[in-house]
Amino acid sequence: MKTYDYIVVGSGIAGLTAARVLSQHGKSVLLLEKATILGGSLARFRVEGIPYDVGFHFTGGFTDNADGVLDQMLGILGVRDRIRPLFFPREASHRIIFPSLNTSYTVPSGIEVIREKLKQDFPRERKGIDRYHERYRNVVEATPSLNLLGLDEFPKPISEDVITLKDVIDECVSDPMLKCLLGALCMCYGTRPNEVSFKNHCLVSYSLQETLARVEDGGDGFVDALVAVLQQGNVDIRTRTSIEQCADVRDRKVHRFVLTDGSEVSAKACIFTIHPQSILATLPKENLSKGFQNRVNDFEPSDAFFTVYGAIDSPADGGAMTLVSILPDTDLDDMLTCHAPDPVDGPMMVLRSREKDSDGHPVHTVTALEVAFVDTCKQWENTKLKRRPPEYYNYKQQRGDSIVRRMHEHIPECRDMRVIDTASSLTYRDYLHNPHGSAYGIRQKIGQFNVVGRLPLNNIYAAGQSALLPGVIGAMMSSLFVCRNLLGREVFDEYLNSKSCLSTAR
């Protein structure tokens, strides 16, 4: 039986980050991935040779002078120079269309720039806009982990932990469209404004408002960069393999791990970066309290997406990289609530990008993500990929047609798009091996205690987008927090402050 220092389960950005940090400290690591390819939701797929992203579409945290929090984390991992961010135009990062109001709004980058633009465009709400942004800024300043060197301290509780985003917005402003603009980025973590704490909204949206960027080669850019450096270290990587059983539990520690390929290994500790309910299914129930099991089972999935993937052969505008949202109403809570088994005409994001196909030829891609709900496909939840009944494929066709119709109506530059493929929440569930097919793991509800750090078994840890905060930055931070715990604060602080690490982050 082979022995490792650490096992990391899941090869998304959280798993890759944890494996890299531990290997940088000379630890032997076994990285396990249940799928056939590495990357989790970062991994791309290709249809007709055209690349599309599954779960990574854009991010914040990059800056022109490479001092953003994502720049710094990638610098510490030694891969920042391997990844090329592609910035959306600062003056027009995101266009939001309101069909019911017969208007649209262009959102720039930069929190202070956004603040001044909103005050100019909503003059009667100037004082409320200032109050909102001052409160927003106070949350950011009270959270040291948004700065790389603050990662040696877990975020402390503040009053905004127990106040919803909706409460703060309602307190500050009254214009319905302005309320929607202030809360619109909740679609980037799949939780309604009346459910999420104001603090968590600030932490997720902060970097997205400062700068907005894609990455050359999309999610594969992160995966390829990190896998390349992992292969140079003391890391064994196995695909199509996960943990089947945590065995030989003594003194609240797992001493033997039985893998799905039939082999057995041992390790000092294991870090799970997969969905909390998948972690719970792997751990021995007799060693877990009913309270812990109930807490994990009570987690609700975040909203999902129904996605249309398309291509434009000869775009009229030359194929600019754009992000456009279509919001049918101004009430985000209502739009992000499932009212029927088959919701249509919901909130939607449409991303256009320039890519290269398998032969290296330029292609112009379109990804349209309409908010969906995991219950929408509940009637087919016990069916398998490519073995579903005709009714399911009729549903996919009708919903895809509806999305294309809306794009043609509201986004003229997409009228020449041809549909390449579509995906429902079941597609995401089966492709990503998560329980529900939700877009962002668990719903980030106020007052909820996520599963992060050490679990009831003393050498089992949890990280990932459901642990701390969703998104690339939140998932990476969760792994850094766990690694600090495993390596010790003094060692980890020296690591963060070392010249060799930070020189590549500057």
Predicted features by range, described:
Residues 315-423:
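C-terminal segments that line or cap access tunnels to active or ligand-binding sites in enzymes
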Residues 214, 244-361, 503:
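Mid-domain catalytic core of redox enzymes
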Residues 203-254:
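Helical element adjacent to the flavin cofactor pocket in flavoenzyme catalytic cores
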